[in-house]
Amino acid sequence: MDSDNWNFQNNPYFQDYNIGNPNNNTNGINGSSNGTMNLSNSASLFLNKNLGNSDFQPFSLQPSLYLSNSSNNTNNNNNNNNNNNNNNNNNNNNNNNNNNNNNNNIINNNTDEFVFKKISANNLQTPTSPPKDLGFIQTILQHQQELFQKKLSESGVTNLQPDQIQFMFMQEQQKYLTSLNGNDNTLPPLENNFSFQHVNNNNLTSPPQQQQQQQQQQQQQQHQQHQQHQQHQQQQQQQQQQQQQQHQHQQQQQQQQQQQQQQQQQQQQQQLKQQQPQQHPIQSPQPIQSPTPSPSLQQHQTYSYTPSTQQTSLQQLQQQQMQQLLQMSPQHQQQHNQIQQQQAAAAAAALLQQQLAQQQAQQLAQQQQLAQQQLAQQQQQQQQQHVQSLHQAQVQQAHMSQLQQQQLAQQAFQQAQQQQFHQQNIQQHQNQNQQQLQLPQPQQQQHKSTPPTQNTPPVKSPAPQTPTLTTNGKGSKSTPPTTTTTTTTTTSSSSSSSSSSSSSKKKTSNKKTGNLQVPPTPPHHHHHHHNNHHHHHSEGFSDENDEEFIDENEDKSKNKSRSSQNIASRNYRQRKKDHISEVEFKVQQLSLENERLKQENHLLKKGDLGDVMRPDFDFQQVLLESQKLMSQLQDAVNKQDHATIENLLQLYYFASQLRTTVVEREVEKIVHPYTQARLAVMGYRSNAETSILLRPFSTNLWWPKYADEVGLTEEQRKASDILWTDHLKIDMELRTERDQLDREIKELFLKKIVSHGTKRPELLFERETLSTFNSESDYPSSPSSASNSSNSPPTSSPTIITPPDSPLTNNQNNQNNNQMINSNSNNSNNNSHHHHHHHHSHLHGHSPYPVPNGTVHPPPTTAVSEHNKPIELSELLDVTRKLEMLKKNFVKHRNLICDTDLVLSTILTPFQHAKLILRLNSVTCYDFSIVDTITGIWGSINSTLKEGSFIQNLMPDQDGKFEVLEKFKQNQLLDLKGQRPIKLESLQRTYEKLYQTVLGSESPNCQFVKQADYQHQNLLTASPNYTNSPLITSSPSQLTPNSPRPPLDISNNNNNNNNNNNNNNNNNNNNNNNNNNNNNNNNNNNNNNNNNNNNNNSNNNNNTNNNNNNYNNNGNNNNGNNNNGNNNNGNNGNNGNNSNNSNNGNINSVDIQALHQQQKQNLQPQQLQQNQQLQQNQNTPPQQSQQVCSPSSPMTPELNKQPEIVGGDNTNKKNKSKKYQWYSYKTPNI
């Protein structure tokens, strides 16, 4: 699609209005490259330059022609109301027809106004309202133009061309319009619509009023320029004065600052000299340097340490300051002294603060030293306490081991005595002793192999476990106490390094065996250890200090590892929290999006296409902004302001890119699966059309004119031609791809998703019927093809077979019932070689339509065919893939338009490109009010339907079930229980029975028909069109009782002969032959004649004559509907015939009243009462079935023997007992 309003082409919102070109039906509203509507005859808007009779000729709008059908329908409705009141008064009907014609004009004018208001005002010749009375407007314009010419001649303006006079006249009218509209800037300039031949420019004379105005304007401009020049000079002078004053003020401030600085220096020096001997009598004098001096002091210090050249300059400044001080008044001197005193006090306070800060720093240093000493003492105390605690623990462990050994020896002695009584306990005890004795064996062997020597002091192993261990004074490391421990003595013949390594190994072994209960050592081993403990106590004490130092280092490393672990765990927890918060935020966004999608799907399932397909607010805003941009660009082109044109073109390119994002949103709506399924069910097929201006035949017309107007060079023309061919090539490829995708998507929806989707053996129609169609005609080309496809063969266009409960079937059941039966039977015979296997294998299900050839099939089986399987995942993925490709195709087409526009901007100059854009966007016709009205109508229709729309019934619900199919399934189950399938034979039998009952019925007795028939014959011969009737000789009522043709064939022949008035033909078949003679010419006469015949025939009925009249009148009302609907044009054209008909109607009305009076006199009182009751029942509105009494007359004796049947109904069975028979037929829906 070539434009932003691509949805104009495929939406029901945008009607096909042909403006200015009634012959071309395809030139409707089409989208251009910038979201506008272009007219095929836009070039013709600038052709007429002369104001006169031909001014408004090319601007007659064609929607009035297309809307004539709707106005004729209104005429029919009016005729219905009038005919219900009086069918016999033709004068009223003719007047009503005239009124209805007037109403048609009003309706058409209103529609023309509606369309005219939406045309842009870019072309001044296009009127803003439709020309209701062209003659009146032309006279007014001619009169005003004559007055204008007189004024010009009086003012002395002569020798002007007619085009120039018209241009000046239009200028004056435009000024008048601007005054009325409130200075509206939307009116275009007149230079675009008028082209002058500047031949007699020297002969032109302007009016004196214009010259005076020009002179006044020039004087005013000169005066304004002079005033502006004076103001500019004054401003410059004021600025110079202000600058001088500021310079002087700055100089004064600088001098004052220098004076104050010098005074502060002197005061500070004096104060410092006075304060030094008092505060520091012992210290030697030093130069004062504060750690954080103020900026003023820093400046003074720099001056004090400068070289001699600076000192001389300072002396000169001091002298000047002293002279100024002498010149100052005593008041100034006092103020100066006060300022000096304040400054001196501030300097003293700053010095005091510095001294206090130094003292505080010294105190802090002393406190820190004391704290360090205290910490060292505490650490020493802690170490001593730790050593003492270890020694005490070792002693306690030795005593505890001795006590435990004694207790175990006693227990062993007691157990030896009780072996006889406690064998189980003894075995357990022995096992424990064996396990306990196995552990100390390697230790004993080690003691035996390495006896102690005098040169190497023995190293005592530390206690493997201690009850408490302190670390760094910060915390305590507690270990679980053990019941028994082992202590071994080892001799180290190596250096101190080996001892340290053995001690570390012992620590590791003790950690591993800390929780084990080690059995006690034998007595000799314990005695040896006890002796060695006292012998080497002094050497073990030094080893314990080393071990404590190692423990402290290990504790420090453990603390560091713990702190790093804590930091890592803290960082992990923080990252986890952040991750959880991000996940929660994403879940929240997904939930909101899910709710939005649920709402959209709910709307789509309801079938509210109005709300779904309505453009977004952003889309409307973009189009409005583009219209404003076009108006600004038009003004810039008229003024030839190249700078503004370039800026506006940049805005235009940006707006086009912004428009692509909005278009993608609209594309997503169309590509939605529910929307595509709905379009497929409705039989919609996309038709991609290009813009009118961008078609090849139209470009050959306006492009050369544009090239000459703008002055394109040969290089520009060649480059533009190459770009145009490339654009067309890519455009054609994208269109073919889009058509193919659309066809495949519709095919998948119709064959897989809409028809299938769940396992259901009861289907509305067989799947094989779809396979016989061509690939290009699997779905109808337009929605109207669904109603006309029943008469066509299956290979041309498929028939959309709808279920019996759907609205389409209810509307078309009365019209196409017989045709569908006949067409199905004919097609089955013709295409038997294609569907032979199909009828035998797949038509076992009970179809709602009768089966041809009278074959009876068995009930359906429970087996499911291959086509009834659920949709596979691969098929769904295929559908989604094709929908995504369709979306990409739309986006590519949009990008192609934008890229072509950008390349064209490089070929053309900005001025040329601006003119091209304005030409392409000259006419815009996108009205949001039309969209709103259509969506409102759609919403009201959907709100009135309680059960939902037809599309909603076809779509599956949440459980995957179809409502229509479920209803049909229930109906089929009921039919299966009764075992009464629908057959063609049963329908034929019913018609045969009705035909026999009609033949066997008796005709009513007619007594006064003869007089009425002669009178009716006179009326027929008096009509002007009686002799011209082509049906005088061919009367269908001349058939004999033994006629081989059935009545249905007769009605069909009459329908073929008289296409305009089907209902009147049916009435004439039931009545007289003479009435058929005037059906084609004068419809109102036929209706009146039918009324007269019925009334005359009803005079002979003694029982229900009034009832016959009323029924006939009701039937004539229905006939009036169809006659007026078919022959409005004839009534509008023949006013003389209508007047003749009205006269005949008056005569007939008098005759009918006389007949009613005669009938009432002949009737008895009882019969009158019965007639009154029947008349009350006749006040009900006319039904669709028209009841006609079968009359008998001497002119048509055949009717007494064989009345013709137009249709049968159940009312015939109720009236069998009566002497006369009523017959009804249903009027077809036109």
From Swiss-Prot:
Residues 590-604 are annotated as: Leucine-zipper. Its main location: nucleus. One of its GO terms (biological process) is cell differentiation. Keywords: Coiled coil, Differentiation, DNA-binding, Nucleus, Sporulation, Transcription, Transcription regulation. Residues 523-537, 832-845 have a biased composition (Basic residues). Binds DNA as a dimer. Heterodimerizes with dimB; in vitro. Also able to form homodimer; in vitro. This is Basic-leucine zipper transcription factor A. The gene is dimA.
